[in-house]
Amino acid sequence: MPKITKIEVQKKNKERFNLFLDEQFEMGIDIDTLVKFNLKKGQQLEAADMAEIQKYDHYRIGLNKAIQYLSYKKRTEKEVIQYLQKEEISEQAISEVIEYCYREKLIDHQDYAESLKNTMIRTTDKGPKIYQQKLYQLGIEPNIIEIFTELYREQQELDDIIQIAEKISKTKKGPQNKVKEKVMQSLIQKGFEMETIHAVLNEMDFTQDEAVLDDLLQRDLEKIYNKNRKKYTQQKLISKTIEGLMRKGYKYDKIKAKLEESGIADGTEEIE
């Protein structure tokens, strides 16, 4: 039966020990494993004893990795499991580590959801749908997601969302209805709900300077006209130019007037 002949502190990690059986290095263990099994020099160990020691120390390795991983920021169960799997910790050990983390409140999904909610509302321009999506991706329970997504809706101020929308609006150019449409699409992409978006848009003023709009119309007209001038006959070219400008949100009468002003059309052309 193998006998412990030496237990020494590891040089690179003072919290772990090298265990020698019959003068041969057997394995490394941490102090908790050493104490739990009351290991000491001269002690004889059966194969079953060694199996238990190895199993427990593997769990301890996983636990220490999890604690270190959790020390940087809050994590969900899913995140911890994925991390330990990458670290090649066994499924049995992972299960025991997760149980410990819940017991010691190292993993707390309600606390996680609350913290993420506060951070996102305070530091991002994202709406409740993005928050909800993040919680799903992180493996949070559906009932917790439902509760905290509703809190997100309640606590995100409408004035703050209006500021987000106005910031978006400043980056968009073109006719009023098109800018409004672009702002709406951006807010949808940022995770805001239609009821909120409509409330925000109703509070905004999309009126633009007529001179600026006229310059934009002239620029877009020239761009579309020159792009297509070699592809179509004059009548078809005018029709395509009108269609392209209307897709950009310009009004038909404004387009016709600009075409006449530019000498491209005489006012009799219609969309084919």
Swiss-Prot record:
It is found in: Cytoplasm. The keyword Cytoplasm applies. The keyword Cytoplasm applies. Keywords: Cytoplasm. Its main location: cytoplasm. Belongs to the RecX family. Modulates RecA activity. This is Regulatory protein RecX. It comes from Staphylococcus aureus (strain NCTC 8325 / PS 47).
